[in-house]
Amino acid sequence: MMIPPRERKPRQKRITGFLIRQLFLMLLATVSMQAQVTLSDWTQIQIPPELTGNQFSPTRMAVNFFGDLYLLDEERSLIARLPADGDNVRIAGGWGETDELFTSGSDLTAAPGLDVLIVDSDTHRLLKFDRQLNFLEELNLLSTDRPVEFPSAVVRNHAGEVLVASDSEADLTLMNMSGTVISVMGGENYGTDRFVDINSVAINSINEIGLIDSDDRYLVLSRNGRMLWRGSLNMELKFIESTGNEWLVGTAKGEFFIVGQDSQAEVLQESLTQWTVSDMAVGNDTVYILEEGSGHIFQAQLRYAE
């Protein structure tokens, strides 16, 4: 039997009301999020003389679980460890193509675990050091199951697997330290989600992968490369780090945003940065930024309002 049109109206109202309520809750969640995350005042970290001036010019940075900072000098092919207590600075590396030497270090990672990894772009190698920067081993990325040319970024997940970005192919290769390839992500089979220009890569506590691609978009994938979600901001994004269940993305101007699957909000800062950021790292809710040119390092605390 046909239902008269007048009997359908209450149901339509209920559906419309439900949708409006859901949209309101989503908006409320976003607004709440915007008010929850702030950054404390930036403070400068004192750097020993041997890591300044004509001796060392950091261009990339990483931090481990203990708060030790690792600095990469691409021009001089050097890596330095600045312990959390500021004592016993160590410098390793040097120009060369074997063992701890490298010619064009493009990225480094220090967490999770105690090891430090560097990718050397021109020699297509992955170098492994211990926490004190004693050289352990190297892996020729051209000799793996699926060769990786000109590595540009490296991160390590909590299972001990390594994710390496290729500058020539604009893809990500997940492998173990023996060189066995587990999966390759971001190629032609990703269709419109195919990677174009990988700027930054990070991994969170549940081994999800976050990356900045083509400046303005961020993508989140599962450990095996399945696309989980994506988003974009109308600005040039350069950095991504994990924080809790969400992601912190940043620009070279020192603007930061907390992004999730259904939300994005600017991180309010008590004091705005006045410098150009060349790299960013996050450890234990502390954000570290490296100033381009001077090599100065600043830190601030992420604060979450209850």
Spell out what each predicted region is:
Residues 52-65, 98-112, 144-158, 190-205, ...:
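Beta-rich, blade/repeat-based domains predominating
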Residues 47, 93-95, 140-143, 186-188, ...:
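Short loop/turn motifs that cap or connect beta-strands within the blades
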Residues 36-55:
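A short helix->beta-strand "capping" segment at the edge of beta-propeller domains
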Residues 83-87, 130-134, 176-180, 222-225, ...:
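Short loop/turn segments that connect beta-strands within beta-propeller blades
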Residues 78-80, 125-127, 171-174, 217-219, ...:
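A short loop-to-beta-strand structural motif that recurs across blades of beta-propeller domains
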Residues 275-306:
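Blade-level signature of beta-propeller repeat domains, shared across WD40, Kelch, NHL, RCC1
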Residues 71-75, 118-124, 164-170, 204, ...:
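Conserved beta-strand positions in repeat-built beta-propeller and related beta-rich domains
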Residues 21-31:
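Bacterial N-terminal signal peptides
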